[in-house]
Amino acid sequence: MSHLPSSFDGAEQDVDEMTFLEKMTFHCKQQPLVPLGTLATTVAVILAAQNVRSGNKRKAQKYFRWRVGLQGATLVALVAGSFIYGTSQKERQSKEDALREKAKLREKLWIQELERRDEETQLRKKRAELARSRAKELEQETQGLQQELRDLQAKTSSSK
């Protein structure tokens, strides 16, 4: 687990880095009723303009009323979508924050485990060094005792 996954990794691109068409597609996917309302309002305005040109005042008035109603519906869809998207975005943000905190906790625990293992390794090295130095001391002591034994044997054999 040498690399912890980041909560920022993913295919989502920042809105500021998107092109115009990508932004338009992104926002249309967020609030699909707004583009439909805009399109319906545009159609109502075009039909009203055609009827004004042809002199049909009643149909022109009807389409202008449709335009006002569709514009109002589009605004309601925009406000409702913003409210819903804002709420879901806050929830998503809180989930992302929780994931970030969890990743930080994992990283902290991982670092603590590495430090603990490093301390164990250092302790083993110290023990091994102490054991080597103790073995060396014992070897020197053994050599000294052997020399002393030879000296004593030499004395006892020369005194006979």
From Swiss-Prot:
- Report if keyword Membrane is assigned: yes
Q: Which UniProt keywords apply?
A: Coiled coil, Membrane, Mitochondrion, Transmembrane, Transmembrane helix
Its membrane topology: Multi-pass membrane protein
In terms of InterPro entries, this protein maps to:
Hypoxia_induced_domain, RCF1
List where in the cell it is found.
Mitochondrion membrane
Look up the record and report any one GO term of the cellular component aspect.
mitochondrial membrane
- Kindly indicate where the leader peptide sits in this chain: none
List each coiled-coil range: 86-160
Q: Transmembrane residues, as ranges?
A: 33-50, 63-85
Q: What does this protein do?
A: Cytochrome c oxidase subunit which plays a role in assembly of respiratory supercomplexes.
Q: Which family does it belong to?
A: Belongs to the RCF1 family.
Q: What is this protein called?
A: Respiratory supercomplex factor 1, mitochondrial
